[in-house]
C-alpha cells in the first residue's frame, strides 16, 4: 500500500472543502475520500486545526502571486497589489477567509512577512508603522472576503424574500449604490482609503521627525 503523503491529503481536503464548506469538512469525510482510516491522517495532521493551518498555507502558495515586493514596486503599489492578490487567494476556495482566520503562520509565511517588513522599512516606514500597515490591510482583506463569502452562502440558505425593516430614502439610495457597485469596487475603495491614510500619516511623521527614505 502506498504511503499517504501530506500533499495528497491537502489536495483532497481542498477539493472536499469546495464541495461541503469548512463546517462540513471533517476528518471522517476526508478519510473516506482518501480511502483510509482516520488514524492515518493523524500521522500528518494531529487535529482539524492543524489541517486548516496547512490548507491556509496551501491556498496562499497556490494563488497569492504578489506576496512579496516586485522590482518595480514602490510602497503604495506593493500594498495595493499584495492586498488584491491576497483577496484572490482567499476567494479561490469556498470559505477561504474562514480557513485563513486564526491560522498560525508557518515558516514560509514568516519569511514572507520578513521580506514585506524589510521592504517597507527601506521605503521609510518605521518597524511599528510597517507592521501596523500590513496587519490593517490583512484584517480589512480577510473581513471583506468573510462578508462576501458569507453573503454568497446565506443567499442560498435563506431563500425567498427576507422581510426588511422600512428604509429611509437616503438609506435605500446608499444600499442600492453599494449593491450596484459590487464587492470588487467596495474592496478597491476601502483599500484606497487605507493607503491614502498611510500616505497622510507618513506626511505627519515626516513633519515631526524629518524626511525618511522613500518619502515623495
Swiss-Prot record:
Binding, Mg(2+): 100
Highest taxon of the lineage: Bacteria
MF (Gene Ontology): DNA-binding transcription factor activity; metal ion binding; transcription cis-regulatory region binding
Binding, tetracycline: 64, 82
Induction statement: By the [Mg-tetracycline]+ complex.
Pfam family, any one: TetR_C_1
Record-level GO BP terms: negative regulation of DNA-templated transcription; response to antibiotic
Segments forming domain HTH tetR-type: 3-63
Gene3D superfamilies per the UniProt record, alphabetical: Homeodomain-like, Tetracycline Repressor, domain 2
DNA-binding region listed in the record: 26-45
Keywords: Antibiotic resistance, DNA-binding, Magnesium, Metal-binding, Plasmid, Repressor, Transcription, Transcription regulation, Transposable element
InterPro entries in alphabetical order: DNA-bd_HTH_TetR-type_CS, Homeodomain-like_sf, HTH-type_TetR-like_transc_reg, HTH_TetR, Repressor_TetR_C, Tet_transcr_reg_TetR, Tet_transcr_reg_TetR-rel_C_sf
Its biological purpose: TetR is the repressor of the tetracycline resistance element; its N-terminal region forms a helix-turn-helix structure and binds DNA. Binding of tetracycline to TetR reduces the repressor affinity for the tetracycline resistance gene (tetA) promoter operator sites.
Protein name: Tetracycline repressor protein class A from transposon 1721
Record organism: Escherichia coli
Gene name linked to the record: tetR
Amino acid at each position: 500500500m502506498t504511503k499517504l503523503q501530506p500533499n495528497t491529503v491537502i489536495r483532497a481536503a481542498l477539493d472536499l472543502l469546495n464541495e461541503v464548506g469548512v463546517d462540513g469538512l471533517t476528518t471522517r469525510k476526508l478519510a473516506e475520500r482518501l480511502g483510509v482510516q482516520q488514524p492515518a491522517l493523524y500521522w500528518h495532521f494531529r487535529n482539524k486545526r492543524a489541517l486548516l493551518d496547512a490548507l491556509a498555507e496551501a491556498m496562499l502558495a497556490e494563488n497569492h502571486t504578489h506576496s512579496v515586493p516586485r522590482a518595480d514596486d514602490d510602497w503604495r503599489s506593493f500594498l495595493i497589489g499584495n492586498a488584491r492578490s491576497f483577496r484572490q487567494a482567499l476567494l479561490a476556495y469556498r470559505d477561504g477567509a474562514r480557513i485563513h482566520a486564526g491560522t498560525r503562520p508557518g515558516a514560509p509565511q514568516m519569511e514572507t512577512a520578513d521580506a514585506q517588513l524589510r521592504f517597507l522599512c527601506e521605503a521609510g516606514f518605521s518597524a511599528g508603522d510597517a507592521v501596523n500597515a500590513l496587519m490593517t490591510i490583512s484584517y480589512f482583506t480577510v473581513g471583506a472576503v468573510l462578508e462576501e463569502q458569507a453573503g454568497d452562502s446565506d443567499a442560498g440558505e435563506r431563500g425567498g424574500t427576507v422581510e426588511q425593516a422600512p428604509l429611509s430614502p437616503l438609506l435605500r439610495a446608499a444600499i442600492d449604490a453599494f449593491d450596484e457597485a459590487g464587492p470588487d469596487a467596495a474592496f478597491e475603495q476601502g483599500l484606497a482609503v487605507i493607503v491614502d491614510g498611510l500616505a497622510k500619516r507618513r506626511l505627519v511623521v515626516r513633519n515631526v521627525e524629518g524626511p525618511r527614505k522613500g518619502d515623495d
